[in-house]
Amino acid sequence: YWTLWQSRNNAADNVLAPALVTFPERRPLAEFILVDDEKGVFDLGSLTSRWSFIFFGFMYCPDICPTTLYDLSLVKKEMLAKGINEREIQFVFISVDPARDKAAQIQRYVKYFDPDFVGATGSVGQLTNLTRQLGAPFRAEPETEDNVYEVTHSSAVYLVDPLGQYTGVIIPPFVAADVAAQFSTLYNADPVQAALAQNR
């Protein structure tokens, strides 16, 4: 997403692009299987019937991950204030450090930011199956002398619609109120959302 980053930081524009960038055509995700923070299955079906905001990171991340999760908690509050149905959105933190981040630990971690946030992880192969579909690469860096390592990962938040289609991406840094306003416009005008509302 270098081109999106470039657009947001082009000094000649003088105006930032929207924090939430949606795609002209949505791409259906292929099946994947992870484990959620209650040791249950987290798969493509877990993303259907609601809008999902997905962030990849790891618990030992010193800055980007806690900051983004906190910002997403603010995004959620702003969305609810705009009348968006809480049951129709979910925020998912997926750990790309399965060697250290276990289900119970992930659950405590995400619930600190919001009690309804969902955590998940899986093997490197399982994670790669999903991250490649979303264009969210990750890589464990070499260990230091004291056996500590970092994980390089995307800082973006990925939006999947209630049909399991990759719909857009939130480019940091972002303002919670702006993201909520942009998503509210999408939510209220989207044909997928309208179909869900009719079936409720």
Regions found by a protein language model. Give the residues of each.
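N-terminal targeting signals for export/organelle localization
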Residues: 1-31, 200
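Short loop/turn microsegments at loop-to-beta-strand junctions
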Residues: 29-30, 51-52, 154-156
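Short, acidic, Ser/Thr-enriched surface-loop or helix-capping motifs
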Residues: 36-37, 161
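Short active-site neighborhood of thiol/selenol oxidoreductases, capturing the structured segment around
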Residues: 42-72
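Solvent-exposed coil/turn segments that connect beta secondary-structure elements
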Residues: 58-59, 94-99, 124-125, 136, ...
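Structural microenvironment flanking redox-active thiols in thiol-disulfide oxidoreductases
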Residues: 69-130
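Structural micro-motif
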Residues: 114-117, 132-140, 151-158
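Thiol-/selenol-based redox modules, centered on thioredoxin-like
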Residues: 143-200
